[in-house]
């Protein structure tokens, strides 16, 4: 059985990225994305937790390894990496999730909104 993770509060997630930025660690793009999720109202229907440079989101609570969008921000290359799988791809020995995309930092919010429409979240 897959591990289940309790979501974090969106204000906590935003504060975590703000603290990283305040320390000069370069997470402005992730903070902007989180602020967009909150201001757009998507936070009312999405559950999430963060682990430094990765934000994991789902429309189910608690979060599992399936039906989770993992957004990683590559600070060095200024790329958003989106990974999504309807199933726990690691459980089935797949090398990567069924949806794996990289986007330039300036496209991250737009691509996030497109993903939500595509997956109907």
Kindly give the residue locations of the regions a language model identified.
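Negatively charged, low-complexity tracts enriched in Asp/Glu with abundant Ser/Thr
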Residues: 1-63
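Generic N-terminal initiation segments characterized by hydrophobic and/or small/turn-forming residues
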Residues: 30, 43, 66, 109, ...
């Amino acid at each position: 059985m897959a591990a289940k993770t309790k979501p974090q509060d969106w204000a906590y997630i935003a504060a975590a990225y703000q603290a990283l930025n305040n320390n000069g660690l370069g997470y402005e793009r992730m903070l902007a994305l989180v602020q967009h999720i909150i201001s757009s109202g998507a936070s009312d229907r999405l559950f999430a937790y963060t682990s430094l440079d990765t934000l994991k989101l789902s429309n189910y609570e608690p979060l599992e390894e399936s039906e989770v969008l993992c957004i990683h921000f590559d600070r060095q290359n200024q790329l958003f990496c989106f990974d999504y799988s309807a199933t726990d791809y690691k459980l089935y020995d797949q090398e990567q999730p069924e949806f794996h995309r990289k986007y330039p930092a300036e496209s991250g919010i737009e691509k996030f909104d497109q993903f939500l429409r595509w997956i109907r979240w």
